[in-house]
Amino acid sequence: MARREGASAAWDRARVAARELGERAGPSAARRVPLAEALGATLAADLPALVGIPDCDTSAMDGYAVCGPGPWRVTGRVLAGAAPADEALTPGTAVEIATGAPVPPGSTSVLPYEHAREEDGGTVSGETEPDRHVRRAGEDTRPGDVALKQGAPVTPAVLGLAASLGHDALSVRRPSLAVLVTGDEVVHTGIPGPGRVRDAIGPMLPGLADWAGARAEPPARLGDVREGLAEALRSAAGAGAGAGADAVAVCGASSKGPADHLRSALEDLGAETVVDGVACRPGHPQLLARLPEGPAVVGLPGNPGAALVAGVTLLAPLLSALAGRPDPAAAAPDRAELSAPVRPHPRDTRLVAVRLTGSAAEPVGHDRPGSLRSPAAADGYAVIPPGWSGPLAEIVRLPR
C-alpha cells in the first residue's frame, strides 16, 4: 500500500491533504436536475438570466401611473398579470395600477395611493418625481446577465432566483458518498443489549455530506471481517468508475486493534495512503486513502465524538473539493477568546467543543471521544495546538 503522508499528520496539514486529494480527483460529474432536486448541490455552470427582471416597465407601488405634471384624469385600471398596454398615456392622464403591473408607455412616474388626492371629475393630484416608483425593464437583471457563477451552493434563495430567471432545471454537482458501517457490536435500531452499541456515526453522515455539498448513500452494514470489508471497498471502487460513489466513508475499523481491518483491506486492494493518523484529540486514528482508479476512502474512528472530528478534518474538505465549493468548516474562519482555561496537549492539536457568545467561546465540557454530548451543544471547535497559551483560538464551525 503506497504511502504519501507520514503517520500522524499534523491536523492542519491533514485538512490540506484531504482538500488537495479532492481537487486532484477533479470535480464530480455534473447533472441537470429539476429545481426541486437541486437544493444543497453546487452550481456546475454559470446561471444566466433567460428573461429580464423585470421583463417590462412595472409599478413598484399600488397607486396611479401618471404622465407629466398633475392633476391627472384617470382613464383606466391595470392589474398585475395584464399584458403591457399598446396605447401610451398622454400628458395629464393616468391609470390606476397595482404593484407589479406593467406601466403604460408614456408613464413618467407612479403616484402611490397614500400620496394621492382624489379630485372632482375623476381626477387625482399629488407630488411626484420623474421615474419615481417605476421599475424599468432589466433594472435588476438584463437578459443574458450571469446572475451567479459556477461553484455557488444552491440555497433556497438560489432556487427562487433561478425560477425568476426562467429556469426549470439546473446543472449541478453533488458528489455521492458510499457509507460502510463496520462492527460486530453495532446495532442500528432500538436499545443495544450488553456488550453492544448503537450506531451513532451512520446517522451523522447524511448531514455532514449535505453540509459539504454531497449526498450520503444508504449505509452498508458489515461485520469485522477483512475479506468482507475489502469486497465492499472493491464494489465502491467499481461504482466510482461509473455513476456510483465519488468517495467512501468507513465507520470504525480505522484504528489498529484486532478487529480493525481497514488498513489491511486497503493494502489488499493496492490503495494509496494519503494520511495515516492525525495528531489531534479526539480523532487520532483517522485515515485517508485512494483506491486505484477509484474513489477516495476516509476512515472514521469508531468512537462517535472522534468520528465527528474526523468528519471536519478529512471528510468535509474532501467532499467539498469534489463538489467544487469551499470547505464549509474553513469558508469563514473565526477567532474567539476562550472564556475558560483549556490545557493544550503536549504533542497533538486539541479540538474543544465551544459555544459562541459574541466574541467569546465557552467550552462546553464532556470532551470524550466516545460521546457526542459536547458537539451536540456546540457551535464549533476551538483549535488548541501544542504550546497554545491563549486566550484567542481559531474556531472551526460545525454544521447546524
Where are these regions (language model features)?
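C-terminal terminal segments
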Residues: T58, P69, T75, T123, ...
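Short glycine/threonine-rich loop/turn motifs
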Residues: A212-E337
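Phosphate-binding glycine-rich loops and their immediate beta-loop-alpha structural context
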Residues: H133-V250, S255
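A glycine- and small-aliphatic-rich helix-loop capping segment at beta-alpha/alpha-beta transitions
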Residues: S109-E118, R196, A265-E272
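Solvent-exposed alpha-helices and their adjacent loops that cap or buttress functional pockets
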Residues: D57-S59, P84-T90, V103-P104, R117, ...
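Phosphate-interaction motifs
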Residues: A2-D168
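N-terminal intrinsically disordered, low-complexity, charge/repeat-rich segments that act as generic
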Residues: M1-R19, L205-A212, A247, H261-E267
